[in-house]
UniProtKB/Swiss-Prot annotation:
UniProt keyword terms in alphabetical order: Biological rhythms, Cell adhesion, Cell membrane, Disulfide bond, Glycoprotein, Membrane, Secreted, Signal, Synapse, Transmembrane, Transmembrane helix
Stated name of the protein: Neuroligin-1
Highest taxon in the source lineage: Eukaryota
Protein function: Cell surface protein involved in cell-cell-interactions via its interactions with neurexin family members. Plays a role in synapse function and synaptic signal transmission, and probably mediates its effects by recruiting and clustering other synaptic proteins. May promote the initial formation of synapses, but is not essential for this. In vitro, triggers the de novo formation of presynaptic structures. May be involved in specification of excitatory synapses. Required to maintain wakefulness quality and normal synchrony of cerebral cortex activity during wakefulness and sleep.
Cellular component, GO, one term: neuron to neuron synapse
Residues exposed to the Extracellular side: 46-697
Taxonomic lineage from the root: Eukaryota, Metazoa, Chordata, Craniata, Vertebrata
């Protein structure tokens, strides 16, 4: 595993450049260069012994273990399990950023997994509501991985490939004695290896990196794979909305893990300048959020602005989904504090009280957010996440990273199963209930809900087969998939590609055959994970007990080649070609497919399945329903309040505002056939007896009327206000600079943020001096409101967290974007209500 001499100049040059960049301490240049060169040669001279794998890191020596894989084409992998990357976040360090681990003098055995971060288990089992099908179908097995819990849980696992596998030797032999073989070596044999850091999902509430064995991916792709534990739930994301507990500790754990990797992976033969982060579900949204945080900047090995990692793969999750960010963390902090007897007004005392509680008492509390949202997760704290993710993307904060992202065909499978009885299809009444419940939980304006419901029903009704329950089930599945995954992913890809940054988009259309999922299911959330990890190559496992076929093995090899190619070069097509003749004697279809870069104009994506092809504009009609039409419907009720992140409030204290009574009728702002004669208004659940031609006529008439009456009336005003909104973005969300980096003292940072807040207040007030407004930020895109629950209260202010007082006011029952009571459900009772209608979304 020692580096060849031809690679030494490359590392020496990197060390010299890093030294020059970091010479700010005033040390003599000669001494600085000498120290960097000694460090570099120490890294290069280390040899990883397969028999007794011992590595000396910056914190001490660790011993790994060699593991043979159950496939003759895969070489052995050396595993280093339970490696500490941070100090235990216990006691007064709870709800604090992580600190580097303490060094050790003896050899540390890294041969078994470390404890997982605390999470809620009931009678030894994780919650039943788990989204990935392989979680739900193997809940007992998954639960066995999270029994050993401890707050001392900040560890990672490293999987290092060896050079003696048949696949490696085959590629090396094919190179022969060609000149410049080092430059042409498509497997990176002998050189520093790319590094892939996997972030697990679980809705920021459950999971562990220990679940994901990176051995096959490391061996087949000749990359180093790392899996990480990070703090979850209340311990990882509690925020009081001020300096008492800023939140985002789980994200800071991941940043510390990347910092540790950048500084130590060279000892394992890894390349600190080729680090890729990837994850699925909530792990994918973490990946996206890390690309937007200035904490990810700064790699001591290089003067590059790309920071602690250079590439990112977001599988079935981005920062724009409704479940990606918690918009009212202080409310949930107060609820938790009340449950455990820490409900004091001063937030500093509140946090001190929570720090003294046993961790199990905290994680066992049931704090339920609105459906499709999260209670404890990443927050806009003005620091780790400086602003709303969409605004940061519009400003190009992630343009320095190569990004691959995508979705699965039927992500919303568990949403459908958890809402309605779908074994025999979906009845008309169940379909109506699901859509109404969906709208009530995601959109907070009562006057326009009737129009929105009918619009969604119209768009997701297959009019050629509208009476078929199985067809309704299929369209309902598409509704959840499109809103929660596809539209956010496409919006993210559009924003990233707008800056010319390399962007690749995929749609995954395959899943393994098993009796544990219904026959009608498509590729559901998490179904791509076993193929990324190469599980089909070693056969069924406890976590993935599928009947893998040769097609599954072939597809897994294809996916691993794409993923590891991207980690090596930023291009999934290079350098290793798609060659799976070791599985099939005939070429696979992927050999003839070139995965084209994504652009907003063409929106090209790769269809990953047994019949691969490059297509364009993935589900364009439905995507634009959510990204274009629905936001316009949301704002047609009151065009004078165009910016949906502001709302007028009386000059008196908002806590004195009376709530709307449940008995108050909710009427639509738009005339419909239903409102003409209330006596003939049908029940929302008598769909089977309803004349769909009448509904179609009504919907078309309403839509045509809205378009005709509003396009001419509001076109000019829309353009003017849209232009002003973008101008406000530029003024109110200033670009970050390195001046507010970690080198600032806390007092300087607080003062800086306070000054920004004061300046921005005056600047924003000049926009509407006659209005009293309550803002979550200077106006972001109106699609921000699409990601909030109806009872969201804007308690966090981007870039101004230090300005929030050290007390949390009483929980406000009103949503500031509308006038109905938070949490009110405007749908009629469902004949078969789901027992957990507000269960936390798991992604």
């Amino acid at each position: 595993m020692a580096l060849p001499r031809c690679m030494w100049p490359n590392y020496v040059w990197r060390a010299m450049m890093a030294c020059v960049v970091h010479r700010g301490s005033g040390a003599p240049l000669t001494l600085c260069l000498l120290g960097c060169l000694l460090q570099t040669f120490h890294v290069l001279s280390q040899k990883l012994d397969d028999v007794d794998p011992l590595v000396t890191t910056n914190f001490g020596k660790i011993r790994g273990i060699k593991k043979e894989l159950n496939n003759e084409i895969l070489g052995p992998v050396i595993q280093f399990l339970g490696v500490p990357y941070a100090a235990p976040p216990t006691g007064e360090h709870r709800f604090q950023p992580p600190e580097p681990p303490s060094p050790w003098s003896d050899i540390r055995n890294a041969t078994q997994f470390a404890p997982v971060c605390p999470q809620n288990i009931i009678d030894g089992r994780l919650p039943e509501v788990m989204l990935p099908v392989w979680f739900t179908n193997n809940l007992d097995v998954v639960s066995s991985y999270v029994q050993d819990q401890s707050e001392d849980c900040l560890y990672l696992n490293i999987y290092v490939p060896t050079e003696d596998g048949p696949l490696t030797k085959k590629h090396t032999d094919d190179l022969g004695d060609n000149d410049g073989a080092e430059d042409e070596d498509i497997r990176d044999s002998g050189g520093p290896k790319p590094v892939m850091v996997y972030i697990h999902g679980g809705s920021y509430m459950e999971g562990t990196g220990n679940l994901y064995d990176g051995s096959v991916l490391a061996s087949y792709g000749n990359v180093i794979v790392i899996t990480v534990n990070y703090r979850l739930g209340v311990l990882g994301f509690l925020s009081t909305g001020d300096q008492a507990a800023k939140g985002n500790y789980g994200l800071l754990d991941l940043i510390q893990a990347l910092r540790w990797t950048s500084e130590n992976i060279g000892f394992f033969g890894g390349d600190p300048l080729r680090i890729t982060v990837f994850g699925s579900g909530a792990g994918g949204s973490c990946v996206n959020l890390l690309t937007l945080s200035h904490y990810s900047e700064g790699n001591r090995w290089s003067n590059s602005t790309k920071g602690l990692f250079q590439r990112a793969i977001a599988q079935s999750g981005t920062a724009l989904s409704s479940w990606a960010v918690s918009f009212q963390p202080a409310k949930y902090a107060r609820i938790l504090a009340t449950k455990v007897g820490c409900n004091v007004s001063d937030t500093v005392e509140l946090v001190e009280c929570l720090q003294k509680k046993p961790y199990k008492e905290l994680v066992d509390q049931d704090v339920q957010p609105a459906r499709y949202h999260i209670a404890f997760g990443p927050v806009i704290d003005g620091d780790v996440i400086p602003d709303d993710p969409q605004i940061l993307m519009e400003q190009g904060e992630f343009l320095n990273y190569d990004i691959m992202l995508g979705v699965n065909q039927g992500e919303g499978l568990k949403f459908v199963e958890n809402i309605v009885d779908s074994d025999d299809g979906v009845s008309a009444s169940d379909f109506d209930f699901a859509v109404s419940n969906f709208v009530d939980n995601l959109y907070g304006y009562p006057e326009g809900k009737d129009v929105l419901r009918e619009t969604i029903k119209f768009m997701y009704t297959d009019w050629a087969d509208r009476h078929n329950p199985e067809t309704r089930r299929k369209t309902l599945l598409a509704l959840f998939t499109d809103h929660q995954w596809v539209a956010p992913a496409v919006a993210t890809a559009d924003l990233h590609s707008n800056f010319g940054s390399p962007t690749y988009f995929y749609a995954f259309y395959h899943h393994c055959q098993t009796d544990q999922v219904p026959a009608w299911a498509d590729a559901a959330h998490g179904d791509e994970v076993p193929y990324v990890l190469g599980i089909p190559m070693i056969g069924p496992t406890e976590l993935f007990p599928c009947n893998f076929s040769k097609n599954d093995v072939m597809l897994s090899a294809v996916v691993m080649t794409y993923w590891t190619n991207f980690a090596k070069t930023g291009d999934p097509n290079q350098p290793v070609p798609q060659d799976t003749k070791f599985i099939h004697t005939k070429p696979n279809r992927f050999e003839e497919v070139a995965w084209t870069r994504y652009s907003q104009k063409d929106q090209l994506y790769l269809h990953i399945g047994l019949k691969p092809r490059v297509k364009e504009h993935y589900r364009a009609n439905k995507v634009n329903l959510w990204l274009e039409l629905v936001p316009h419907l949301h704002n047609l009720n009151d065009i004078s309040q165009y910016t949906s992140t502001t709302t007028k409030v009386p000059s008196t204290d908002i806590t004195l505002r009376p709530t709307r009574k449940n008995s108050t009728p909710v009427t639509s702002a738009f005339p419909t056939a239903k409102q003409d004669d209330p006596k003939q208004q049908p029940s929302p659940f008598s769909v089977d007896q309803r004349d769909y031609s009448t509904e179609l006529s009504v919907t078309i008439a309403v839509g045509a009327s809205l378009l005709f009456l509003n396009i001419l009336a509001f076109a000019a005003l829309y353009y003017k206000k849209d232009k002003r909104r973008h101008d406000v973005h530029r003024r109110c969300s200033p670009q970050r600079t390195t001046t507010n980096d970690l080198t600032h003292a806390p007092e300087e940072e607080i003062m800086s943020l306070q000054m920004k807040h004061t300046d921005l207040d005056h600047e924003c007030e000049s926009i509407h001096p006659h209005e009293v407004v309550l803002r979550t930020a200077c106006p972001p895109d109106y699609t921000l409101a699409m990601r909030r629950s109806p009872d969201d209260i804007p308690l966090m202010t981007p870039n101004t967290i230090t300005m929030i007082p050290n007390t949390i006011p009483g929980i406000q029952p009103l949503h500031t974007f509308n006038t109905f009571t938070g949490g009110q459900n405007n749908t009629l009772p469902h004949p078969h209500p789901h027992p957990h209608s507000h269960s936390t979304t798991r992604v």
